[in-house]
């Protein structure tokens, strides 16, 4: 159990440190966004100022708390093809009929490192001027190492 906690803490620390050395971008709202990954359809960023340990435990025999729940904001920017795919997957073409309108989304997420789960607490979709196009409420908790992560 103790080895698993060390491994989880090590993975989490590695993840957070790798995030801090990535390129920084600024959104229209003035927040600093750090680049995570990109492909032909999507670019992913996170806001370092939004990362908070919302729950932690103090394992016996240690002097530092172990994060058991982390919340943060992530941003997804869309190419035309990515916007088209997102609109189709969310079945919101009646709300956003033109994929060129969809510029980016900002999601609030919760990560539970020990369970390797991630949950979208909410996500808001914007046009290029920052106008809200559509919002989605809380999603299902998903394993970060499964295909289920990409299904919603």
List PLM regions with ranges.
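Bacterial N-terminal signal peptides that target proteins for export
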Residues: 2-12
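Bacterial N-terminal signal peptides
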Residues: 11-20
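N-terminal secretory-pathway/extracellular module detecting exported/lumenal segments
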Residues: 26-107, 111-152
């Amino acid at each position: 159990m103790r080895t698993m906690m060390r491994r989880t803490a090590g993975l989490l620390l590695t993840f957070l440190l790798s995030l801090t050395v990535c390129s920084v971008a600024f959104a229209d709202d003035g927040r600093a966004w750090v680049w995570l990954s990109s492909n032909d359809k999507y670019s992913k960023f996170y806001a370092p100022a939004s990362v908070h340990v919302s729950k932690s435990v103090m394992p016996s025999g240690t002097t530092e708390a172990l994060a058991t729940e982390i919340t943060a904001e992530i941003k997804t920017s869309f190419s035309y093809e990515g916007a088209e795919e997102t609109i189709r997957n969310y079945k919101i073409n009646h709300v956003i009929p033109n994929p060129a309108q969809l510029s980016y989304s900002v999601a609030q997420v919760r990560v539970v490192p020990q369970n390797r789960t991630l949950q979208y607490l909410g996500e808001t979709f914007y046009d290029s001027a920052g106008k809200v196009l559509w919002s989605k409420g809380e999603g299902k908790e998903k394993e970060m190492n499964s295909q289920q992560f990409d299904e919603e």
